[in-house]
Amino acid sequence: MENFPTEYFLNTSVRLLEYIRYRDSNYTREERIENLHYAYNKAAHHFAQPRQQQLLKVDPKRLQASLQTIVGMVVYSWAKVSKECMADLSIHYTYTLVLDDSSDDPYAAMMNYFNDLQAGREQAHPWWALVNEHFPNVLRHFGPFCSLNLIRSTLDFFEGCWIEQYNFGGFPGSHDYPQFLRRMNGLGHCVGASLWPKEQFDERSLFLEITSAIAQMENWMVWVNDLMSFYKEFDDERDQISLVKNYVVSDEISLHEALEKLTQDTLHSSKQMVAVFSDKDPQVMVTIECFMHGYVTWHLCDHRYRLNEISEKVKEQKTEDAQKFCKFYEQAANVGAVSPSEWAYPPVAQLANVRSKDVKNVKQIEKPLLSSIELVE
């Protein structure tokens, strides 16, 4: 295993943050905690329901961690949408993270997908059954064009996760494969379209801006995620199918060359994002900028990405990139480092346990009632 290229990672991260003029001022601390708890509380009650518990079959600790991660992502990044929209998106994207972490083969459950869809029957695949049930709660916030993007991108994401089950990095020489898979499982169009709720944006009058934002966001958000998650995935056996490592296989290049390819694409996309929308509708630009800054804050502060380890490792170094990275990290931590104990309560497992007891109590109360009716008959 190669050593992690710390200096290169620092330089790339610093350039990214400078290109987007990183300065997250999306919330006061009180507003951030309020929105985090609101979105978490609604989502936690959703996943504590008996049907969700029965069909998902996810380890409680993993579900809790997934929910906390996604609530953070949505609240930090979708800073301009309503709290209700944040909560509904948090539920939707938690479902996607649960699927992404799953290792179940979907083949058998997808045999009759289209026939069931056409006939209006519940999907055989439990994930689709639950996602479809929740989808109306998400789509009610958006116009028809954005809604279509959310539906289509979610379908693509499912297919991308299916492909990833095979741990296939592409055949050597198949240069289109890495980006094909990354676009499919990146949820870029879903994310890009979900920034524009109909109560704030008229998708007809802003159709060109919204379409362009979806196109730009598709690559920007997945490439930034790939870059910021490179450290956590570097030596994790479960994360060996990544864009960078697929470049190594398909393009037959070194890890350093693959990382450089991702770096140049990410920086170019960041420049485009700022340049394209700087003279467009001000509300559109503010929304995009808030998303970009919040999305970076989330990556820097969420423990899933372990970037605090990088900061600790280089904080005594005197190089310009190390000092700049630590300054950016401190800047992000000052606004985004909020302990889950301040907002992620009560735990989903506790809520599920209460619901389970309530169901049992109802059944116990109902049983003698039925017996009495039978006796009368």
UniProtKB/Swiss-Prot annotation:
Lyase listed as a keyword: yes
GO molecular function, one term: trichodiene synthase activity
Reaction equation(s) it catalyzes: (2E,6E)-farnesyl diphosphate = trichodiene + diphosphate
Any single biological process term in GO: sesquiterpenoid biosynthetic process
Enzyme class per UniProt: lyase
Transmembrane spans: none
Pfam families per UniProt: TRI5 (PF06330)
Pathway: Sesquiterpene biosynthesis; trichothecene biosynthesis
Enzyme Commission number(s) from the entry: 4.2.3.6
Recorded superkingdom: Eukaryota
Keywords, alphabetical: Lyase
Xref: Gene3D superfamilies: Farnesyl Diphosphate Synthase
Family from the record: Belongs to the trichodiene synthase family.
Misc note: Trichothecenes are sesquiterpenoid toxins that act by inhibiting protein biosynthesis.
Name of this chain's protein: Trichodiene synthase
